[in-house]
Amino acid sequence: IHERLVGSEMCIRDRRYILQAVNTDVFKEPEKLMSNIEKVTAFLRKNGCGERETLSLVKARDNKPYFTDGDSNCWRMYDFIEDSICLELPESNEDFYQCAVAFGKFQRFLDDFPVGELYETIPDFHNTPKRFADFTAAVSKDALGRAANVREEIEFIKSRRDFYPVLIDNEKAGLLPRRVSHNDTKSNNVMLDSVTRTALCVIDLDTVMPGYSVTDFGDSIRFGASTAAEDEKDLSKVHFSLEKFKTYAAGYLDGLSLIH
């Protein structure tokens, strides 16, 4: 398979498809990743999502949702979603609203999905206490001798240690349900109709696994309600936009609809 085909459209018998290579450096067990995607997309279709409202996998000849070639490269193919666009960044508040609608609908249609059937493809992805423990261990080791240069930032993180177990503690207490979470809820993971600019579907399901809807919402806000790019080095440009927050919250709630 020629490298130029990866992640691009291809036409076979008047139908267009997207061919992608699965990143096995990140996802060591691609069969589990693809099992998650297959189950979630099938459930979305069963619950009423139309042809353009969810990704549709093209099965390999052995009926698996992926193909492994002779060099152990893992490939998958999706139907191409016609008359759609994907924005790297929202170009208007309405675009941001529609992205929120898409992620809200994603939660709504997966509300009763048996989340225990999904694999955790990136272990402890949102286990904040473990992340903090790993952080403090790295600070103590100080392998490159740079900790002294960021002492203020280190203390900032340590001073908030009481907040880090909140989600896990609330799940244990039965107050926070574990749901299907997307875990990469950026605007460039939403397809919009190219004419109406309304939400079609959520894409890039590689990180779909058991989690919390609050982390999906929070990730969208972290990325979308900021006044600067996430890698901006000039912190004077980084602010929280309440207007963008309200826009996203309204769209997300509209997408959620009847979820309580």
Task: Outline where the language-model segments fall.
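Single conserved hydrophobic/aromatic residue that forms the stacking wall/gate
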Residues: 1-7, 12, 260
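Short strand-connecting beta-turns/loops that link adjacent beta-strands
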Residues: 13, 71, 195-197
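Protein kinase-like catalytic core scaffold
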Residues: 17, 53, 76, 179, ...
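ATP-dependent phospho-/nucleotidyl transfer catalytic cores
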Residues: 20-21, 27-31, 81-99, 112-182, ...
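Glycine- and acidic
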Residues: 22, 202-203, 231-235
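Conserved ATP-binding subdomain of kinase catalytic cores across diverse folds
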Residues: 22-133, 213, 255
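Catalytic activation segment of kinase domains across protein kinase-like and atypical kinase folds
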Residues: 189-219, 223-226
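Active-site activation/catalytic loop segments of kinase-like enzymes and analogous catalytic loops
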Residues: 214-256
